[in-house]
Amino acid sequence: MLTPIQNFLKQEAAGGILLFIFATLAIILANTPLSYLYFDFLQTPVSVQIGAFIINKPLLMWVNDGLMAVFFMLVGMEVKRELLEGSLSSYQRAVFPAIAATGGMVVPAIVFLVFNATHPEFQEGWAIPMATDIAFALGVIALLGKRVPLALKIFLLALAIIDDLGAIVVIALFFSHDLSPQAFIFAGIAVAILITMNRLKITALSAYGIVGIILWASVLKSGVHATLAGVIIGFCIPLNGKKGERPLDDFEHTLSPWSAFAILPLFAFCNAGVSLIGMGMDNLTSTLPMGIALGLLLGKPLGIFSFCFVAVKLGIAKLSEGINFKQIFAVSVLCGIGFTMSMFLAGLAFGGESDSENVTALARLGILIGSGFSAVLGY
């Protein structure tokens, strides 16, 4: 089972380096005289209409709501495989990364809320520092080469997968609004078809793609965030086919390069462009970016390491062979690279605010600071 995991880790690491390049390019463009071209590009209107059904959104939203659904589909497939036969397939395997992920979600959120206790207008962003960008973190680890044992990389992967599950639950519970019963009915029908296809062990990617698009459009109109459709599709892809084939692995092999080398870099390019023009120390020291930055930089390692340490000392879990607490601490610092998922959650948290552009810019500034320092210190 290590071969697909090793392939996944290698691809995510390469994608993480590309993420860094595109994020840097976005920051540069957003702070040059050509910044208006960059921001106008993000707001380019794109419409799709079929009869009376129409979706009209700016390009930025198509990336965040549409292309990111493919990324979450891959997350769903990866979670399913790891739950059935991978690093999360038994209590003994799952308990240690699960405890680590719990600490890595709870403590950063607490740090953020402590910093923003007197600023209720910012408290919607409590989930932002909970996230870990697995591609970025693995990209940093890749720079260390063979000095990092495979067991530690698998621990990081399992932790990040559970972290993603936590983010999915947060999105479903706290970022749903203006629910539409009619759209839910169409979404329910699409899910029923996907489950039936899974039971029949249908392995055609095109079939799941067609039903998946219907599900995505229905979820988009339902008021629940559309990326959750991707997770559902991922869970419905069968692990094994009728003739011994591996459709889930095949689909992941087909889509992973598109996600790692196109979707996530494009997402980074569209979301990392924070204009620093006109920002002063009062912006940098605002409780919003400080809460996010310290949630990632301090909350993540404190939560992950302390929860792991206590769990081992109490006998609830044990360290994997070849891993020590020093390595766990280093990984916990790298988990403070929230970048992609934190940017995504920031857009959900503050997208509806009247002063959303300024608030979101401050949130992204905090993400960049916290993620940047975490990458440097973790390395």
UniProtKB/Swiss-Prot annotation:
Family of this protein: Belongs to the NhaA Na(+)/H(+) (TC 2.A.33) antiporter family.
Membrane topology field: Multi-pass membrane protein
Residue ranges of the TM segments: 14-34, 59-79, 95-115, 125-145, 154-174, 175-195, 200-220, 221-241, 261-281, 292-312, 328-348, 359-379
Entries under InterPro entries matching the protein: Na/H_antiporter_dom_sf, NhaA
GO molecular function: sodium:proton antiporter activity
Record localization: Cell inner membrane
Gene Ontology CC terms, in alphabetical order: plasma membrane
Record has Transmembrane helix as a keyword: yes
Free-text function comment from the UniProt entry: Na(+)/H(+) antiporter that extrudes sodium in exchange for external protons.
Keywords: Antiport, Cell inner membrane, Cell membrane, Ion transport, Membrane, Sodium, Sodium transport, Transmembrane, Transmembrane helix, Transport
Recorded superkingdom: Bacteria
GO biological process, one term: regulation of pH
Record's protein name: Na(+)/H(+) antiporter NhaA
Pfam families for the chain: Na_H_antiport_1
Catalytic reaction list: Na(+)(in) + 2 H(+)(out) = Na(+)(out) + 2 H(+)(in)
